[in-house]
């Protein structure tokens, strides 16, 4: 590899710009291509990292000790994988950096995220996950990263890659508000429209537990109007900081996860907070964020609280 493309385990305090996790899978390659566009858009460096785990070996006798240390072997395999990313970015003219790092992929990316603007990963890697199930890295990383994480799904299409809006889910929580301002900055950078969305749950599921609960179209419409008014106030606040940004608001009624998944198919980016108004505050992703990541039709950015 050239000096520009060399692997490194030092200099972790440098600005990493757009950080992409690469394990050689097709979705990781898709994440690298997405990362190149993002780095070019942000006018920052693109850093691709391949992690490798150090094996714990027990040898019964001296004769069974391999001539090449297992950790050196693991590092060489990672460097070999990383050459695929180098080839993918052969024609990329922006500043780029490639490195290997010891440790599990999620842990490495979480640590490096402290020095990155954004981390990008594929929804699944080579861990054997199939169907609509997130890989372990794309599940753990958004919940612990120090910067926003973008997860690129297999079903992501190019139809809305540049023309669709940036959509952000707003729920009135502090986390949701941070996500809203992050989405506004992202939309401004992309020259895209920003759509603020509050999903109002239909409420039918409560009727089993509260059969005397009165649910009517009038009640729903009244609450929808209240939420719309609140959303328009948030939009007005954003307009003061982003005067050139085109803003729209919507308050659809339905299941939050299903509604946001449907919206993701026409958005160039869907932005979520790690956790919303749920009462359980933990190191886990909120149920809506986790559900959207599992089923999304387009790239999703998760903003840390």
Kindly label every feature range from the protein language model:
Residues 118, 196, 224-231, 267-276:
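Conserved N-terminal glycine/acidic-rich loop preference
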Residues 138-157:
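Short, structured interface segments
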Residues 121-140, 163, 269-295:
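Glycine-rich, Arg-bearing micro-motifs that act as flexible, cationic patches
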Residues 66-80, 215-229:
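A short acidic, glycine-rich active-site loop
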Residues 122-123, 149-154, 300-304:
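Short beta-strand elements of ligand-binding domains
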Residues 2-66, 164-217, 239-241, 246-250:
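Small/aliphatic-rich secondary-structure junction motif
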Residues 1-14, 27, 56, 69-72, ...:
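Structural beta-alpha unit
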């Amino acid at each position: 590899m050239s000096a520009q493309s060399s692997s490194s385990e030092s200099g972790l305090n440098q600005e990493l710009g757009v950080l992409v996790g690469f394990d050689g899978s097709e979705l990781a390659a898709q994440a690298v291509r997405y990362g190149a566009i993002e780095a070019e858009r942000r006018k920052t460096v693109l850093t691709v990292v391949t992690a490798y785990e150090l094996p714990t070996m027990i040898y019964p006798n001296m004769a069974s000790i391999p001539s090449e240390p297992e950790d050196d072997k693991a590092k060489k395999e990672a460097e070999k994988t990383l050459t695929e990313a180098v080839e993918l970015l052969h024609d990329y003219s922006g500043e780029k950096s490639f490195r290997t790092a010891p440790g599990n992929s999620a842990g490495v990316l979480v640590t490096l995220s402290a020095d990155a603007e954004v981390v990008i990963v594929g929804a699944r890697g080579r861990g054997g996950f199939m169907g609509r199930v997130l890989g372990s890295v794309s599940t753990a990383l958004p919940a612990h990263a120090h910067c926003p994480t973008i997860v690129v799904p297999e079903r992501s299409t190019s139809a809305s890659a540049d023309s669709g809006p940036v959509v952000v889910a707003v729920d009135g929580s502090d986390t949701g508000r941070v996500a809203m301002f992050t989405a506004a900055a992202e939309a401004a950078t992309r020259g895209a429209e920003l759509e603020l969305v509050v999903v109002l749950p239909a409420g039918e599921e409560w009727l089993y537990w509260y059969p005397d609960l009165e649910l009517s179209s009038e009640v729903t419409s009244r609450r929808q109007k209240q939420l719309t008014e609140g959303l328009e106030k948030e939009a007005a606040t954003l307009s003061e900081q982003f005067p050139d940004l085109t803003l729209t608001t919507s308050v659809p009624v339905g299941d939050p996860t299903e509604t946001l998944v449907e919206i993701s198919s026409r958005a160039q980016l869907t932005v979520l907070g790690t956790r919303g108004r749920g009462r359980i505050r933990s190191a886990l992703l909120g149920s809506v964020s986790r559900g959207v990541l599992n089923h999304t039709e387009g790239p999703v950015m998760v903003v840390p609280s």
